From Swiss-Prot:
The gene is MPH1. Pfam families: Helicase_C (PF00271), ResIII (PF04851). This is ATP-dependent DNA helicase MPH1. ATP-dependent DNA helicase involved in DNA damage repair by homologous recombination and in genome maintenance. Capable of unwinding D-loops. Plays a role in limiting crossover recombinants during mitotic DNA double-strand break (DSB) repair. Component of a FANCM-MHF complex which promotes gene conversion at blocked replication forks, probably by reversal of the stalled fork. Gene3D superfamilies: hef helicase domain, P-loop containing nucleotide triphosphate hydrolases. Signal peptide: none annotated. It comes from the Eukaryota. It comes from Pyricularia oryzae (strain 70-15 / ATCC MYA-4617 / FGSC 8958). InterPro entries: FANCM/Mph1-like_ID (IPR039686), FANCM_DEXDc (IPR044749), Helicase/UvrB_N (IPR006935), Helicase_ATP-bd (IPR014001), Helicase_C-like (IPR001650), P-loop_NTPase (IPR027417). Residues 38-49 have a biased composition (Polar residues).
Amino acid sequence: MGSDYDSFDDDVADEVLMALDKPATSGLHSREQEQQRDISNATPHTSTDLELEDFGSDAFDYSPERERAKPIQTARNQARTFQQTTLLGRIASQAPEPLGTQPRNSRVFRADLPPEVPTHHALDPEALKTWVYPTNLGPIRDYQFSIVKNGLFNNTLVALPTGLGKTFIAATVILNFFRWTRNAQMVFVAPTKPLASQQVEACLNIAGIPRSQSTLLTGETKPVLREAEWEGKRLFFMTPQTLMNDLSKGYADPKRIVLLVVDEAHRATGDYAYVKVIEFIRRFSKSFRVLALTATPGSTVEGVQDVIDNLGVSHVEIRTEESIDIRNYVHSREIDRVVLEPSDEMLRISELFSQALKPLHSKISQQKIYIGRDPMSITTFGLLKARQDWMKGPGRFANQGLKMMLMAIFTILQSLAHAIKLLNYHGIRPFYDNLVAFRSETEDKGQKGSKYKRQLIGEQSFQEMMDLASKWLKIDGFAGHPKLTHLCDNLLNYFMDAGEGSSTRVIVFSEYRDSAEEITRVLNVHKPMISASLFVGQADSKKSEGMKQKQQIETIAKFRDGIFNVLVATSIGEEGLDIGQVDLIICYDASSSPIRMLQRMGRTGRKRAGKITLLLMKGKEEDNYAKAQDNYEKMQKLICEGSRFNFRHDLSSRIVPRDVKPEVDKRMVEIPIENTQDTSLPEPKARSTRGKKASKKKFNMPDGVETGFNSVASMLGISASKTKAKPNKSPKKAESKETDEISPVPPLEGVLLSVKELAELNKKYRDLPFFHQDTEEICMPSLTARPDLQRVLRPTVHVKHGSYTKRCVRLFKKLSHSQGIETRHTKPHGDTDKSRYLDISVPPFAEDSGEDVVVVPSGRKRSLSPSSAASPPPPGRKRKANTTAAPRSKRQSVVDEYASESEDDTAAARQRKTNAAASPESKRQSVLDEYASESDAEAVTQASEDEESVGSLADFISDGEANGNFPKDMTGFTSDEDDDYRSGSLAKSSLSGPLSGRQVHRSSGAASKSGSTASTAAKPFFVPASLPGTQQTDDDEDMPDIGILVGKKQPETRVRKPAKKSNAVFLSSDDDDDDNDDEDDVQPGPAKRTVRRRVIEDSESG
């Protein structure tokens, strides 16, 4: 390479050098004298050129040059006879160069490079004095030593044939950067987890890096575990996709990465994860080393250049099998090419399938879209290319119907081209399975499917072909392809020659999974001599599931241990897998890619001589293999020459200071004890971060970046004085700080409402009328409600919580913690009510024979006279109210009683309607609900008005009450204001209805037995209810005598009719049998009247 630069001076004319040394003259006269002198001294060749010196430099740009003596043309000059032009017609050498980032292909010297920015990594000055080369594996190999030395100081692309120790080179470079830096991190990335797992053993057991400082991360590892590993470990083995995710989420710090080892670097093209990782790290740091490992850099010059640009490679170390320094370490590989002819069965199937495809193939041939006579020669790529060319050309102006028809035919033929490839290169069974799936899909759609698909499967030749294939595949021992027959014979002979107990192993490579499954099935027929296992990728197919990474690792381990001796693998086994002592490689199908072919061949000949057998079909497959071999040899020469590639010296930093020159230290590296005790993979354990969660996403910023806002003036360097003065804004008012002192208590006159305001409040807001009949009361808000919310600070808008509020909240919260867990949220400490008062059984009704009813004080039940005691109903059953009906009209009575909480609150009434009997001949029934409150609130009762029967009230009056004698237990129902109204209100009241004359009074002492009237009126205990006008009547015939009501007279006996159902609301009863009481006969006399009365418990919980 240096000879090209040294010979540059020979191409420069001596006249040009002499002209550069002469000083420039001024003036026309001096110029003419100089020209005459030059002409007289010039040679015939140069005199003509000097005469044209006055013309412009571009006067003869497009004129032919003067013919000179033709020099002897060399191979280099002959290559310059062709000129490359641009799209505008200019010569490529004269066209302006694009603004690219690649430097010119020139020799780079250290002195010509700009001064390098010191690295931001913390280095160990003592360790930088030496670099270690391990001698654990035996003698030193020169090519490995040279590659490691260059890889320490340059971004290097290492291209070595398989089995020559690329992993050892990577482990040595990792070891030295591990020593040189204090807390920097090294990452080894591989395309798959099995490949990454293999590198762990080499780095830990060869380089001696502590196991506690290394880890293996994949996509299966939880993010919280990966984050913890990035914080404490220094060496990472992972897939590029996982590394990209950790970088983007902020788990990994790109500034800490000092070394990135890329395995199978030929994948670093396009949008692969390798490219994204390098770009991401380079955004934040340029001080990191890249070591790229591969066996085949690429198949084209452009592909290799993409790898160099994407990885920032500045140096290439490439070796071939013919290189002198590796010739002693390459084992011989015997390549055996077997060319086979198609079988008679294949030819018959091809003939029938060609007849079936002929109608569809002729339609695209007539349009001159796809030229070809034989339908069996179609390929997927050829059809796709022809379709694109037609759409860009004649297809743009074609009829829409024609275009849609041709596109449908193209789609069908492209799907069938894969089946043709399976038939030609893999066998009849994969071909038959593919067409069975095609036919089933078409038949399932029925008439909704493509008509061209139905036309194809309806062809007689297609049906005959499928019948023949199905019949042949049912025959035992039918191979279906000559490759299968030759494969079985070759393996049987190979294992028989190896002898029993041999440890030899074989790998069979196939491109498609269907073909690999068929090969495995056929080989396992010859057990126990041949024991085959399938090795495929993780993706699922239509017929079978993929292999997880764990299953892949287990399969490789079993193959190494000799549990089975044949491994049938797809492309997943081509790259990088160190499967072990493989002595025979069989390529079931040849690939046109030289990368894939070399990767396959590299699986053998690693530690001893190997053999490679290629099974090729005569024709196209044989030609593809020849092209792959030629392309590989050509690319190896170009890479070794290096003149066609531009290397990125600008992206390769030395990291180690230039004044530091480490010396090599060849020694035996000590392996830590922890590396030998535990042989498992260093994967993070789930128990180490139990209960932790992944942190939020972090955003890494480059060094020196300003995260704040910069004005345009500051970016242009304009001082603040030159900028326009900003208008003065009014200063913001200082926010009042919170004080610990409580504000003084205001006087009550300024806070409480006046008498007038209180009356207005009661009138407008507290007492809301309901149809101008009843009064509904709105209670004031309670400060003790919602105790759970008083233990937490509620959201605020304008006013923040004060210090005393916070102290109170903490106090309430601390008090709640002092309660038990079960009672913390129940009343009175919470809002939950667990008293279960609804589950209390309803008290039994008592039979009233007209005698006195004794009211039991609070906490006791109301007692009955011995003659009227009734047995309690069974618990758990609801009691329904007895209903009777009058002969003429329905009788309704609603009685509700409420007690208010304070003495100042006025009483309001709510109606509860029940049906009651109105006939004087029937027994009297009514229901009274009594509620007791904590304060001395007044109780209000309502009775019916005009058409309500007086009999419903008679049930509440005993003989003693009728004579003015109230029981002593009734004294609690009177107030001090009712002392003047303890007797004789019946004579004074004016009756406007049947019941308005009857009043039930409260008594604080013994009631008077006389019926005398009082001079003053008091507030009644029962308030008459206002009934709608539709139920009013002037008929008072049903009005019974007062004597009958109090039991002094006997009413006339009448026959009762069954009561009709009413829409009134009744209190339910626990005894369903009480409904039959409506049919009881009426018995004269108060002593024989039996009416069920409810015994009310006079307590707060009732």
